[in-house]
Amino acid sequence: MTRLTEVYPADRITLREVGLRDGLQLARALPATAAKIAWLGREGAAGVRHFEIGSFLPAARFPQFADIDAMIAVAARLDLHSAGLTLNERGADAALATEIREMVCVVSATEAHSEANMRRSRADAVALVGRVAALRDAAAPEKLVNAGIAMAFGCSISGEVDPEEVVRLAGACLDAGADIVGIADTVGYAGPKAVGALCARLDRLCGDRPFIIHLHDTRGMGIANAAAALDNGARVIDASLGGLGGCPFAPGATGNVVFEDVVFMAESMGFPTGIDLGGLKEARSIAEEAMPGEEFHGALHRAGPPENTKWEAVGAD
């Protein structure tokens, strides 16, 4: 638990930038490695410390992650916490050979989605979490294992999802050896009431252990859902710069909840982030220039902070 609470302190919120992984998985214009490094560095300088930096997947099929080793090395040099998606033992072995600090596994909330998109049952997915944790324990016990529950608020195949199943799977992943679990609104079905209720249940399950919520803004509910999550025990939120991203299971999905908007919302609710909005704006400019034609989002980017007021992120340098 000590290692976990050092990375994700329970007494404050943590925002994870997932744009370099989730934000690029469906991107048409892929940024060059140099641009990704500049993006990472500028956002890190703005106070962002946690980055989901890529996926350990075959470079021939996923060229956007071919430079993951280089990105991990840069993150390590900058003392940023890096996480990478590990979908099988081969990915875990690759991750263990790097300086990645967190390995992310995925378990689907529904059997139909698990079989259709991961080619394994939910039980097998939980067992994989256990095997990844065992590999970690043997080779690099300082690394964290993160188990994310996909389709936690609704499934593109099965429809409604029983919250009891989500909580059960989260508990099973913790029992299997995961250090931290997360719940994902993968296809953007959730509303604030459902988010608040499930976060409250997960908070009870996890106790002193933090959990992650991963939100998409498919139907414009992302920022309201993030606020509901904070009000009900969530202290780690995934977001992406400019709302980059999409979901292969949700045609027309507009991506993740916007990182800049989440920072502004959290500060307005009294949750210090230590993140500088001006620095985020500069990082966004780097990403936009590197990805011509890609759609970026954000209410704060469009309107700016409120006029005639002094807005400053609490704790920002």
Task: Pin down the residues of each PLM region.
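Catalytic cores and adjacent flexible loops of soluble metabolic enzymes
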Residues: 1-317
